[in-house]
Amino acid sequence: MSRRAHPERRCPGCRLHLALCLCGDVAPIDTVHRLCLVIHAAEANKTTNSGLLAARSLRHCDVKTIGHTRPEQDDDVAGALGLAVTTRCVLLFPADDARPLADVVAEASGPITLVVPDGTWAQTQKMRRRVPGLQALPCVSLPAGPPTAYHLRAEPKEGGLSTLEAIARAFCVLEGPQAGPVVEEGLLSIFARFVERTLWMRGQLADRDLVYGLPDAARRVSPRGGVAAPGSSVG
C-alpha cells in the first residue's frame, strides 16, 4: 500500500517527500569535465526525474530547460554552448554516426562539455532537431555496462538507462581510470538511495528490504496514508 500521505509536500530539490529528503546526502562532486543538462519542461516536473539529481551532484554543471508552452520561456541553449568556448562540446545521443566517448576523450587536449538531453525518447529526438546549437554537436555513445537499476519507470528501449545512470557512466569515461570510477560511484550511490526511498514510499519495498535505511522522520509516515503515532510500525 502506498505511503504517499501528502504527495504535494515534496522537497523542491530532490523531489522526494519531505520526510524522505536526501539533499543532505548530496555532496557536489568536483570534475575536470562539465555537464550541460538540457531538460524538457515536462520532464523537469516529474518526481521520478533523475537528471536533475545528477546535476545537483556535480559541481561543474549547467541546467537549461526547454519545451515550455511559451517559447520565450525557454533557456538559451545555444548561448550556453557558445560560452563554453574553452571546452569541446559533445552530445550524448545514440545517433547512427555517434562515436565512442572514449575515442573522443583520447583525442581531446582539454576539458569536454558533455551535453545531455533529458526527456522521453520522442522529446529528446525533437530537442536534437529543433534546439539551436544541438544539431551541430558531434554525438557520442557510451560503453556497454550493467543493466539499469532504475525501477521507477518502464524503459522504452532494451538496454536503456536512466539519465543519471547514463551521466555516471559517461563521467567514468571522461574523468579517466583513477577519478572516473569514483565519480561514477558517487552518482550511483545517491541514485540508489533515491530509487529505494521512492519505492518504499510507493509501498513497493518493505522495511526489511531496505539497504540504505531511512531518515528518522520517515518512520512517522504511515503505510495507510497518514502520520503514524509514535512507536507505530511502518513495515
Give the positions of each predicted feature:
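Short, flexible, mixed-charge glycine/proline-rich loop motifs
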Residues: 1-5
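Short metal-coordination and nucleic-acid-contact micro-motifs, chiefly zinc-binding Cys/His arrays
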Residues: 7, 17, 31
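Short cysteine-rich clusters marking metal-coordination/redox-active sites
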Residues: 11-14
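Cys/His-rich microdomains that often coordinate metals
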Residues: 18-21, 25
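Histidine-anchored nucleotide/phosphate-binding helix
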Residues: 46-57
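C-terminal folded domains that constitute the principal catalytic or ligand-binding module
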Residues: 113, 121-235
